[in-house]
Amino acid sequence: MEANAAVDGTGNPIPTSAVLTASAKHIGIRCMPENMAFLKCKKNDPNPEKCLEKGRDVTRCVLGLLKDLHQRCPKEMDAYVGCMYYYTNEFELCRKEQEAFEKVCPLK
């Protein structure tokens, strides 16, 4: 398995920093309800145990999204993730790959 791979051999997402950074805009849009529910829970209850299920909801959403993105645009996602990995998550150096990724897998 390559260090810059977005998924493992079985097609499950590998949430490395490069994968998460490359997918951050999509995560922010698609998983907003889960993230907001988790943040609201954390704000309202200082007991971490009370928010574990909300945290699992966020994780489930992100992993599902990563799998979906990789199924819909594997070549573009792998190129963008590979660039982000190579350049240590420097967006400015990966704009060409980002544009290709967002063209095939648009933000919605």
From Swiss-Prot:
Residues 28-69, 70-108 form the CHCH domain. GO terms for biological process: mitochondrial electron transport, NADH to ubiquinone. A motif (Cx10C motif) lies at residues 94-105. It comes from the Eukaryota. Pfam families: CHCH (PF06747). GO terms for cellular component: mitochondrial intermembrane space; plastid. The keyword Transport applies. A motif (Cx9C motif 3) lies at residues 73-83. It is found in: Mitochondrion; Mitochondrion intermembrane space. Disulfide bonds join C31-C61, C41-C51, C73-C105, C83-C94. Contains four C-X9-C motifs that are predicted to form a helix-coil-helix structure, permitting the formation of intramolecular disulfide bonds. Complex I is composed of at least 49 different subunits. Accessory subunit of the mitochondrial membrane respiratory chain NADH dehydrogenase (Complex I), that is believed not to be involved in catalysis. Complex I functions in the transfer of electrons from NADH to the respiratory chain. The immediate electron acceptor for the enzyme is believed to be ubiquinone. Belongs to the complex I NDUFA8 subunit family. This is NADH dehydrogenase [ubiquinone] 1 alpha subcomplex subunit 8-A. The lineage of its organism: Eukaryota, Viridiplantae, Streptophyta, Embryophyta, Tracheophyta.
